[in-house]
Design a protein with these regions (language model features):
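Bacterial N-terminal signal peptides
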Residues: 7-17
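N-terminal, Lys/Arg-enriched amphipathic/low-complexity engagement segments
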Residues: 36-65, 80
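Positively charged n-region of N-terminal signal peptides that target proteins for export
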Residues: 1-4
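Acidic/hydrophobic-patterned starts of short beta strands in beta-sheet-rich repeat architectures
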Residues: 29-36, 76-91, 126-140
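Short, solvent-exposed aromatic-acidic interface loops
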Residues: 64-65, 116-121, 169-178
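Surface-exposed loop/turn elements that mediate protein-protein interactions on large endomembrane-trafficking
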Residues: 49-62, 101-115, 158-168
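Repeated scaffold domains used in trafficking and secretory/extracellular systems
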Residues: 67-75, 117-125
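Acidic, small-residue rich beta-repeat scaffolds with periodic aromatic anchors
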Residues: 21-42, 132-281
Length: 281
C-alpha cells in the first residue's frame, strides 16, 4: 500500500486542481482580466482579482463574489461613456448583506462607490437606453412586526448628477383614491392579527399597517400615509402618536431618506389604483 501512496496523492491533487479550476469564473474586457474564485466545496470566503495588462490592480478576499449577470462587463452604467464592471459581493455571517461593487474600466482602474443590496441581491435593468439599479430597502426589517412579515421596499436608482439617486420617473405614483384608502384602512383596523391589552397597550401589530404606509411614502405620498394611519388605527389601541414618531425616526435611517423626501415634491402622473412597492415577494 505504501508504494502506491505517491500515485494516490498525485491523483488527489489532480482532482483538487480540477475542482478549483471549475470554481473560477473569468471575464475579459480590453486590457482587463477579471477572475472570481470560489472553493469547490462552497466554503466562504471567495476571491476577486482584477488584472490590468496582466498585473493585479485589485484583490478582494473577504466575501463571496459573483459577476452581475444583469449588467455585462463594459456596460456604460452611468451614461458617462465609462465602461464599468459590476460585481455582487455577499458578506456571510450574522451581519450578512449583499453589496454591488462598481469599477470603472478606463485607462486606470477606478473603484466607484458601491450600491447597497441588503438582505437580497440587487440587479441592473436597461430601459429606454438608460441603466437602472433595482434593490430592496431593508431599513424596516423586524420593525414592530416579525422579520418574515416586515416590509422591504423596492427602490429603483438611476445615475444622476454624479451619484445614484431614486429614479422619480420609476418610483413616483399618484395618490390612492379616497374610497380605496378607506377600504384598506378598514381591513387593517379590523384585522385579527392585532393583539391589544385591555389597557390599550399593543402586543402585536397588523403588519399591513407599516407596509402600506411605506408603500405610500416610497411612491411620494407621505401625507396619505399618515391619513391611512389615522383611519386604520384601532379605537381601543394606545400609542398612535408614538408609533408615528418611531416610524419617522426609522425612515430617517434609510440610505434613501433624502431622495424619499424629494420624491414627494415631484408632480405625480395621476391617481393610482395601487401602491404596492414594499410587499415582499
Amino acid at each position: 500500500m505504501r508504494r502506491h501512496l505517491p500515485t494516490l496523492l498525485i491523483a488527489l491533487a489532480l482532482i483538487s486542481a480540477a475542482g478549483a479550476a471549475a470554481a473560477m469564473q473569468e471575464q475579459r474586457f480590453g486590457p482587463y482580466d477579471v477572475r472570481i474564485s470560489e472553493p469547490s466545496d462552497g466554503i466562504w470566503p471567495g476571491r476577486l482579482e482584477i488584472l490590468l495588462n496582466g498585473r493585479v490592480v485589485y484583490r478582494g478576499s473577504d466575501r463571496t463574489y459573483g459577476f452581475a449577470d444583469s449588467a455585462p462587463i463594459g456596460a456604460d452604467l452611468t451614461g458617462s461613456r465609462e465602461p464599468m464592471l459590476a460585481v455582487s459581493a455577499y458578506s456571510n455571517g450574522g451581519d450578512c448583506c449583499f453589496e454591488m461593487l462598481l469599477f470603472g474600466l478606463g485607462p486606470q482602474l477606478r473603484l466607484a462607490a458601491p450600491l447597497p443590496g441588503g438582505k437580497s441581491e440587487g440587479k441592473f435593468e436597461r430601459t429606454g437606453g438608460l441603466w437602472y439599479y433595482i434593490a430592496r430597502d431593508w431599513t424596516f426589517a423586524g420593525w414592530k412586526v416579525d422579520a418574515a412579515s416586515s416590509p422591504a421596499c423596492r427602490v429603483v436608482l438611476a445615475y444622476q448628477k454624479s451619484r445614484w439617486r431614486l429614479a422619480a420617473e420609476r418610483m413616483r405614483r399618484g395618490a390612492l383614491p379616497g374610497t380605496l384608502l378607506n377600504q384598506l384602512a378598514a381591513k387593517i383596523r379590523g384585522s385579527e392579527r392585532w393583539r391589544i391589552k385591555p389597557s390599550g397597550e399593543i402586543e402585536a401589530y397588523e403588519p399591513q399597517l407599516p407596509t402600506l404606509m411605506l408603500d405610500l411614502v416610497y411612491t411620494g405620498n407621505p401625507a396619505q400615509a399618515e391619513t391611512l394611519l389615522d383611519a386604520a388605527w384601532p379605537p381601543k389601541a394606545e400609542g398612535k402618536a408614538r408609533f408615528l414618531r418611531d416610524f419617522r425616526r426609522e425612515l430617517a435611517k434609510s440610505p434613501y431618506a433624502r431622495d424619499i423626501r424629494r420624491l414627494a415634491k415631484v408632480s405625480p402622473p395621476g391617481e393610482s389604483d395601487s401602491a404596492e412597492t414594499c410587499e415582499r415577494d
